[in-house]
Amino acid sequence: MRKIIHIDMDCFYAAIEMRDDPSLRHIPIAVGGNADRRGVISTANYPARRFGVRSAMSTAMALKLCPQLKVLPGRMALYREVSRHIHQILSRYTEWIEPLSLDEAYLNVTDSHHCYGSATLIAQEIRQSIFDELQLTASAGIAPVKFLAKIASDINKPNGQYVIPPDRVADFIKVLPLRKIPGVGKVMVQRLANMGLETCSDVQKYDVIVLVKQLGKFGQVLWDRCHGIDERLVNPDRLRKSIGVERTLARDIHQWEQCTELIESLYLELEKRLSNVKPDLRIARQGIKLKFDDFQLTTQEHVHPLLDKQDLLQLAQKTWTSRREGRGVRLVGLHVTLQDPEIERQLLLEW
């Protein structure tokens, strides 16, 4: 049976700012963009969260919810440096580390001899080391599979941990709300509720064939999760699957010519980022993103073998014409999906 730990730093960016300036500790703060420039919140501390401030929320909305909120611009170079230090701490216990972002990672400690092989004690020691060396707190979840470890890490936040041992998995899952499963968002929660499914126990009683017919591939994934199945390994060589660039505008745009100028600028940035990963600019798909002044988001993409500016412009113009409906546009983004390395390798093999 595997022993998986999910380490999740507590309000990471904000925690670093509070560490470096103790006067911020007991007031609501957030790291994010300027409200005048249509900024977005990256993270908020717990005093701010009590007012309803959340990540990915517009800074303007956050300030409406919490007028006294102090919004800091963020120091990404420092956050990356701290993240590297955290990774060094994790690597003392296992080489099987899968970073998910700067502030969270999975560890497989199944074969670790540290702390007598106890995943619970390893997680405690990691969290203590992070605090001793960086004066930051982390939460942890311990379980036999990845998705349960991730769910568990959220249960005793902040600065806590939760263990789901193998003999408690079945009971834990039975009462688990479907909204707690990673990948089940608000739209899917409503769709499942319309099908009479609200907990994992409900899905366990559902015919898997019918579920797949109704939900496609995700139906099988959901059925597996509701039975405690997650075969995904902790992957230290996790590869980037996509690259994107986007810009939130200080003022809404209403003219296609304005959008064209922005896409020209974004394309140069996307091309530069992609060339660092794929010098030949080969991709699997490319697409565009538009967010309107009512915050509705639309994304369009299609299969394309190479990064292609003209194709992106055509796709964007088609989306602009068919989806905008007179609304202003507050965000424009471009993205590419990279080729699966295994598929790419197979395509290069000789017959």
From Swiss-Prot:
Binding residues annotated for Mg(2+), in chain numbering: D8, D103
Pfam families assigned: IMS (PF00817), IMS_C (PF11799), IMS_HHH_1 (PF21999)
Catalytic activity, as annotated: DNA(n) + a 2'-deoxyribonucleoside 5'-triphosphate = DNA(n+1) + diphosphate
Keywords, comma-separated and alphabetical: Cytoplasm, DNA damage, DNA repair, DNA replication, DNA-binding, DNA-directed DNA polymerase, Magnesium, Metal-binding, Mutator protein, Nucleotidyltransferase, Transferase
Cellular component per GO, a single term: cytosol
Subcellular location per the Swiss-Prot or TrEMBL entry: Cytoplasm
UmuC domain: residues covered: 4-185
Enzyme's top EC category: transferase
Top-level taxon: Bacteria
Alphabetical GO biological process terms: DNA-templated DNA replication; error-prone translesion synthesis; SOS response
EC identifiers of the protein: 2.7.7.7
Needed cofactors: Mg(2+)
Keyword hit for DNA repair: yes
Subunit structure: Monomer.
HAMAP family for this protein: DNApol_IV (MF_01113)
Protein name: DNA polymerase IV
Organism: Photorhabdus laumondii subsp. laumondii (strain DSM 15139 / CIP 105565 / TT01) (Photorhabdus luminescens subsp. laumondii)
Gene symbol of the encoding locus: dinB
